Structures are given as C-alpha cells and as structure tokens.
C-alpha cells in the first residue's frame, strides 16, 4: 500500500477515534500500512455517523481524495475513495455498517458491538467472537453456511458464551450445530418474532427503511449498475 493510502486511512481512523462509537470489524491487523483488502468494514452507531458525516466529507475532500462511488442503504453506507497518482488511481473503500441485518430484520445492532470493542493503539476493533457473530448471523439468515475459509474463526468462537447467548436470543437455538441444520426461512421467522417482541415500533421502522432504500437504490435509480472486485474480507 502506498504512503498516500496509508495517510488517508490514518486520517479517517483518527477522526473516528476522536468522535465516534465505532470499531473495525475485520482485517485490521496491518492498518494503516497494510490493507489486506481494499475495503475497510466499520461497525458504527447511526448516531455517531450522523454527527461526524460532515467532518468526514470535509476531511476526504481537503486531502485531495474524491468519492467516486457512494451507496446508502438501510444498514450500510459505502464510500469508494480515489486519489489520482498520475498513471494510476489509489482506491480505498469505507463500508460503514449500522447493524447486522437482512431485509430490515435486525440481527445485531452496532451498539451491541461497540460496547465490547478493544483498542490496539491505533484503532478500535472487534474480537473474534463478534467478527464471527456478524458473519454467522447474516449467513444463516440468508440461507448460507458459514464460509470454510473462516473455519478458524468458528473454531475460536463457537464455545464462547456471548456467541451462544446471542444465537439463542435471535434464532432460539441452543447451539451453533443446531442452527446449522435449521432451514433459513424458519430462522428468519424466529428473528422477526424476536424483533417484534422486544421493539415492535423500531422493527416496523427498520423494515420500512429497508424498503425505501431498496426502491430508491435499485428500482427508481437511473444510474445503472457497477461491478466491483475486492479482496477477501
């Protein structure tokens, strides 16, 4: 990674450190000098993001970087930032997640993540069990199994009490193994029930927000589609 990208990452992380309840979800070990994948996944409370958005945009613009792709969905805001270096373009993608959810159905909110974040001297990050929960809850809800390439993560997190309690609260199962063998439609219905029992008004609002952003981004938009290739996350 170039010094230009490393400085850009350092500047944005510095802003987040000073102003936001956030954490980097994964692939944070080499930052800012070594970014394992072009995109950097941030879990952040919606309140924190709204409060620092204008400062973030000012920082990006004042440093010579340009936002070349922008996506705003119900659970995620993406900035693909580019910097022209003559014959090539430096790219850094920031993915700001407000929660782990599917179709507006909340599985785990950012506030649940960031209250357990750790600091390594440069950035806030999530421990393995929370990295696992983010991926596992989402994958099972959409009908996918946990990726084999993250088997090491599953092995480390599967017996963790926090993991067991969260999966039980969302999907009403007693173990990961049980969850693996239940149809995703049943898991989603259980997640919906858990949401409406705990926070009925918020649950309705989340689904409406999903529908509104989906229609705006993919049905009413006339900007077309783009295909991007990123590294492992």
Show which residues each predicted segment covers:
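Hydrophobic anchor at the beta1->P-loop junction of P-loop NTPases
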Residues: 227-229
């Amino acid at each position: 990674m170039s010094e230009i990208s490393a400085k850009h990452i350092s500047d944005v992380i510095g802003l987040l450190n000073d102003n936001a309840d956030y954490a980097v979800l994964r692939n944070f070990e080499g930052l800012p000098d070594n970014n394992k994948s072009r995109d950097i996944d941030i879990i952040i409370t919606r309140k924190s993001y709204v409060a620092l958005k204008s400062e973030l945009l000012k920082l990006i613009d004042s440093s010579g970087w340009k936002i070349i792709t922008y996506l705003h969905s119900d659970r995620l805001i993406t900035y693909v930032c580019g910097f022209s270096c003559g014959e090539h373009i430096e790219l850094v993608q920031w993915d700001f997640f407000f929660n782990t959810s599917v179709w507006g159905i909340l599985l785990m909110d950012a506030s649940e993540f960031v209250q357990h974040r750790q600091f390594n001297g440069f950035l806030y990050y999530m421990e393995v069990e929370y990295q696992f929960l983010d991926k596992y809850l989402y994958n099972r809800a959409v009908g996918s199994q946990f990726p084999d390439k993250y088997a090491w993560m599953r092995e480390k997190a599967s017996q963790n009490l926090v993991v067991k309690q969260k999966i039980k609260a969302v999907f009403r199962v007693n173990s990961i193994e049980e969850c693996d063998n239940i149809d995703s439609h049943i898991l989603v219905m259980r997640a919906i029930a858990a949401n409406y029992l705990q926070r009925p008004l918020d649950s309705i609002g989340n689904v409406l927000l999903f529908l509104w952003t989906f229609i705006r981004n993919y049905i009413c938009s006339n900007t077309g589609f783009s295909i991007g290739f990123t590294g492992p996350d």
